Swiss-Prot record:
Main localization (coarse): mitochondrion
Keyword Mitochondrion: yes
Record bears the keyword Isomerase: no
Described purpose of this protein according to its UniProt entry: Essential for respiratory growth and required for maintenance of mtDNA. Required for cell survival in the absence of prohibitins.
Family: Belongs to the GEP5 family.
A family per Pfam: GEP5
Name of the protein described by the UniProt record: Genetic interactor of prohibitin 5, mitochondrial
This protein's UniProt keywords: Mitochondrion
InterPro entries per UniProt: Gep5
GO biological process terms, semicolon-separated: mitochondrial genome maintenance
Subcellular location: Mitochondrion
């Protein structure tokens, strides 16, 4: 490793557990982990140029909420089988809303916007007629039961976040279902555009849950509590607390989400 980089990282006002991970990734060949290296180098450069703690907070988040954190199984399966699962992704046609007697209580969009958990029971994971490749037979890696379980857990995690704006890193959390708009004549928009909507929606949901708002494991939460308790200065402690200000936890055994104890320090 470049000794200059090693000196810089070793002098950062960060806990050794964080610095060791940064050094480990930066010491690998440049061709290895290119994305991870970029996401480490950019906030590091930001801190060196501007000072302040924002770059350090990004480093802490990237190390402990991404590099060191194993995603839950349902997100790993969504990532691996996204092209298959997007063929079963729930949607709502705008023209179908005209037939509803009570849009507020029956529309998927309105229920999601209002954070109503009952919408999870109304979601259907059936093969829709978009994203088809002519008459080519489709082969699936997952069974219907597996698909339903993965998608239910994905949307349960999304609902947990939707109900808690304090955990958002964005001003507005979009709804996770695909909305199929209408043409001026009242028909569905062209199929090619709908295909794009399904692809974009599954990518954005995966990115939001996997990268932008990852759920800690109970073990990862304990590690962060220990690190914060060991911080030698109040300034370092604040860096970690701010990086954890939107933390929440998934107990994989019970499949329950909860707001992290890390937020209680703030």
């Amino acid at each position: 490793m470049n000794e200059h980089i090693q000196r810089i990282v070793s002098r950062l006002p960060l806990h050794r557990a964080t610095s060791e991970v940064i050094l480990a990734y930066l010491s690998k060949q440049q061709a290895q982990y290119p994305t991870e290296r970029i996401e480490l180098v950019e906030p590091l450069n930001d801190f060196l140029r501007k000072g302040g703690h924002q770059g350090l907070q990004r480093l802490v988040f990237h190390v402990h909420f991404q590099l060191m954190l194993r995603a839950p199984e349902h997100l790993r399966l969504l990532r691996r089988h996204r092209e298959e699962l997007q063929r079963f992704w729930p949607y709502e046609r705008h023209h179908s809303l005209l037939a509803l007697s009570d849009v507020r209580s029956q529309s998927l969009r309105r229920l999601w916007e209002d954070g109503q958990e009952e919408v999870l029971q109304q979601m259907q994971y059936c093969r829709h007629h978009w994203l088809r490749e002519g008459d080519v037979p489709e082969r699936y890696a997952l069974t219907q039961a597996q698909r339903e379980e993965v998608l239910h857990r994905v949307f349960a995690q999304y609902m947990f976040l939707k109900q808690r704006p304090a955990l958002w890193s964005v001003r507005r959390l979009p709804i996770p279902v695909v909305e199929i708009g209408m043409t001026p004549l009242g028909f569905d928009i062209p199929d090619v555009r709908v295909d794009g909507l399904f692809k974009d929606k599954t990518k954005s949901v995966l990115r939001l849950l996997y990268r932008e708002h990852p759920a800690l494991t109970p073990a990862a939460e304990e590690d962060m509590l220990r690190i914060i308790a060991e911080c030698p200065t109040r300034a370092m402690r604040r860096i970690y607390l701010r990086a954890c200000r939107r933390a929440y936890v998934l107990d994989a055994d019970a499949q329950l989400f909860r707001v992290s104890r890390l937020r209680h320090f703030i």
